[in-house]
Amino acid sequence: MKIHKCSFCGADIPPGYGIMYVRSDGTVQRFCSRKCFVSAVKYGRNPRKLAWVRKKKAKTSK
């Protein structure tokens, strides 16, 4: 099974978990949590400007 990366925060998503979102142009985005999904799709936030994303990326990169 393939482990995917979250399109918003970059966290690993194990098989069977997360949200898969397909845009109208056919682009597939995968999210590890509803928090990432809503931040990206509903609010259109930039992950580089959010402190919790930077902390999560630093934690997963170790």
Curated annotation (Swiss-Prot):
Gene3D superfamilies in alphabetical order: Ribosomal protein L24e (2.30.170.20)
Cofactor remark from the record: Binds 1 zinc ion per subunit.
Listed SMART domains: TRASH
Keywords from the named record: Metal-binding, Ribonucleoprotein, Ribosomal protein, RNA-binding, rRNA-binding, Zinc, Zinc-finger
CDD domains per record: Ribosomal_L24e_L24
Key word Zinc-finger present: yes
GO molecular function per UniProt: rRNA binding; structural constituent of ribosome; zinc ion binding
A single GO BP: translation
Keyword Transmembrane: no
Cofactor(s) the protein requires to work: Zn(2+)
Function: Binds to the 23S rRNA.
Record-linked HAMAP family: Ribosomal_eL24
Oligomer status and interactors: Part of the 50S ribosomal subunit. Forms a cluster with proteins L3 and L14.
Descriptive protein name: Large ribosomal subunit protein eL24
Organism encoding this protein: Pyrobaculum calidifontis (strain DSM 21063 / JCM 11548 / VA1)
Gene: rpl24e
